[in-house]
Amino acid sequence: MAKQLRGVMAALLTPFNTQQALDKESLRRLVQFNMQQGIDGLYVGGSTGEAFVQSLSEREQVLEIVAEEAKGKITLIAHVGCVSTAESQQLAASASRFGFDAVSAVTPFYYPFSFEEHCDHYRAIIDSADGLPMVVYNIPALSGVKLTLDQINTLVTLPGVGALKQTSGDLFQMEQIRRAHPDLVLYNGYDEIFASGLLAGADGGIGSTYNIMGWRYQAIAKAIREGDNATAQRLQSECNKVIDLLIKVGVFRGLKTVLHYMDVVSVPLCRKPFAPVAEPYLPELKALAKQLMVEKA
């Protein structure tokens, strides 16, 4: 299972229609598009997937549709994290039923939970996942939960934990985690430091921009494996030029707009309160979509 979890995993977006409802057909196309790019797996229902502006039922629908499209073809990780332990457990049970390979959960947020409460939260989810390994999701910039290195070391050694998604710019901490846990599956979470994360000890990555240029990240990983750091750095720079634009326009809405111009997503909208991409940026995103489609071909 550890080998199966390693690799380049796209953090899947969730398409919506003009009425803000789940766009199931676009979701299916997006799954297929990612598989065509040679992605090793999908991380479903996380931050990129706008999980926290969806109902529990919608999140289950997304998991089911993705499993129908991709189960057995690539690795599937279901993000099931909620503030509520019971809701997280429900999603974990659904992920197991749908045939996912692992579950993941962000640290519970908003309320100032104690570290032991965090540990109990993860234990309960693991108990509901019917044997699926847990990918602990550490993203302090969004969760507001700033785990110490000792706390991370404790979480990743809980029974049932198989991996850590480390969405932090702290590469020193990444290396410290790898040094302490040589067999842990460790994901880099920030796309803009993917190459650096691999050099610091990550086995692979989970990222949002993989949806539109997954082949670039696969090429970076290959270059690192082969010791060609110059190529990895050049490719990372090319990825970061795209990321610069996406940050300027809004990452999730920018990605959906690019995918719309690629004829993958019908409607380039995130769920409110996210706003659409500002009109002056559309020509740049259209040009980017064209460039990437030529490169992909």
From Swiss-Prot:
Q: In which pathway does it act?
A: Amino-sugar metabolism; N-acetylneuraminate degradation; D-fructose 6-phosphate from N-acetylneuraminate: step 1/5
* Tagged with keyword Lyase: yes
Q: Name one GO cellular component term.
A: cytosol
Positions with a binding annotation for aceneuramate: S47, T48, T167, G189, D191, E192, S208
In short, the EC number is: 4.1.3.3
This protein's record includes keyword Lyase: yes
CDD domains xrefs? NAL
Q: Name one GO biological process term.
A: N-acetylneuraminate catabolic process
Known catalytic reactions:
aceneuramate = aldehydo-N-acetyl-D-mannosamine + pyruvate
Alphabetical list of Pfam families matching this protein: DHDPS
Against PROSITE patterns, the record matches this protein to:
DHDPS_1, DHDPS_2
Alphabetically ordered keywords of this record: Carbohydrate metabolism, Cytoplasm, Lyase, Schiff base
Q: Where is the active site?
A: Y137, K165
Assembly description: Homotetramer.
Described purpose of this protein according to its UniProt entry = Catalyzes the reversible aldol cleavage of N-acetylneuraminic acid (sialic acid; Neu5Ac) to form pyruvate and N-acetylmannosamine (ManNAc) via a Schiff base intermediate.
HAMAP family membership: N_acetylneuram_lyase (MF_01237)
What is the protein's name according to its record? N-acetylneuraminate lyase
Q: Lineage in the entry?
A: Bacteria, Pseudomonadati, Pseudomonadota, Gammaproteobacteria, Enterobacterales
